[in-house]
Amino acid sequence: MITICVSGGLKKDRKLAEEAIWYVMDMMMPRKRNLDISLTLKKTLEDGAQGFCYGGDNDNEYIIEIDKRLSRLFGMNELIECIMHEMVHVWQGATGRMKDKFRGGYKQLWMCKDGKYRNYTNTDYEKQPWEVEAYRMQGPITKQFMKDMNYE
């Protein structure tokens, strides 16, 4: 069963976030049947990012935190784009493209084209393959969502 829980922030932002999550689920993971996504709108800018995505206690649980002030400070488009970026990370984790390992120290692993996982823990943020992919995908997904949901 797919469970989506959105909390914090303004009611209109919670509604928009839930719509965006379901949109990405339908578009990128239509066959996924067991996923638990919890999105909290809270202050994250002070922590150095508009949003964060973490794996939960099991492989089907994801926690997203997004700054609750994005829509007011930068506009609705920025909030949607941030949600889409973090949902790309959910997709990466749910499909096995990215893994976090904790045994023997924390490691962030990425499945390369040859099918092997490689450790990118010490790679600069802007060069981490999951971030490169998420930044590349967030714009087109946001644009399509805005068009399909008549937010343009």
Walk through the language-model features, giving the residues of each.
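Short catalytic/ligand-binding loop motif for oxyanion handling, primarily in non-cytosolic enzymes
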Residues: D47-A49, L73-F74, W91-Q92, K99-K101
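Short alpha-helical scaffold segments that flank and stabilize functional sites
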Residues: A20-Y23, W91, M137, I141
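Catalytic zinc-binding patch centered on the HExxH motif and its immediate surroundings
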Residues: L10-D13, T40-I63, F74-M76
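Metalloprotease/metallohydrolase-associated module, dominated by Zn2+-dependent proteases
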Residues: N77, R97-E152
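Acidic/histidine-rich, surface-exposed loop or edge segments in extracytoplasmic proteins
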Residues: M1-S7
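Short pre-active-site segment immediately N-terminal to the catalytic Zn-binding motif
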Residues: I64-I83
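Active-site recognition of the HExxH zinc-binding catalytic motif
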Residues: E81-A94, A134
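Zn2+-dependent metallopeptidase catalytic core
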Residues: K12-L35
